[in-house]
From Swiss-Prot:
The keyword tRNA processing does not apply. Residues 91-122 are annotated as: Disordered. PANTHER family: ATP SYNTHASE DELTA/EPSILON CHAIN, ATP SYNTHASE EPSILON CHAIN, CHLOROPLASTIC. Belongs to the ATPase epsilon chain family. It is a peripheral membrane protein. F-type ATPases have 2 components, CF(1) - the catalytic core - and CF(0) - the membrane proton channel. CF(1) has five subunits: alpha(3), beta(3), gamma(1), delta(1), epsilon(1). CF(0) has three main subunits: a, b and c. This is ATP synthase epsilon chain.
Length: 135
């Protein structure tokens, strides 16, 4: 028995298919979902969704949102998502380095819109790079 997984963004359907296992980046930590999982609704952090089909693992970088698990269906609604297969690892590493430098300029400073924006850019860049390493 498998899970039906849907990953949806406002502008696209990123994934719609079957998976034997799904690992979600919830705001309280990694959340594993197998067939027969109890129903739940959870907030998702910026991070990597991992799904297993047989022995094959696939990753999708998620940019925050929500997930619902109900009757072996996992619906993931996110602000943005990018399959690892579409991410250039070298470019992702470069973006992470740039985002880390931009964020480090705010060390020791109180929160400001610019600091929060830099932190979010860092988290997104890190998720993209992690997704390339998850496959």
């Amino acid at each position: 028995m498998a899970l039906t997984l849907r990953v949806l963004c406002p502008d696209q359907n990123v994934f719609d298919g079957q998976a034997d296992e799904v690992i979600l980046p919830s705001t309280t930590g990694q959340l594993g979902v197998l067939p027969g999982h109890v129903s739940l609704l959870t907030a998702l952090d910026v991070g990597v969704l991992r799904m297993r089909d047989g022995n094959q693992w696939t990753a999708i970088a998620l940019m925050g949102g929500f997930a619902e698990v109900d009757d072996d269906e996992v619906s993931v609604l996110v602000n943005a998502a990018e399959p690892a297969s579409g991410i250039n690892a070298e470019e992702a590493q470069k973006q992470l380095s740039e985002a880390e430098q931009a964020w480090s300029k705010f060390d020791g400073q109180p929160n400001s819109p610019d600091k929060i924006k830099a932190q979010q850019a860092f988290q997104k860049a890190r998720a993209r790079l992690q997704a390339t390493k998850a496959n």
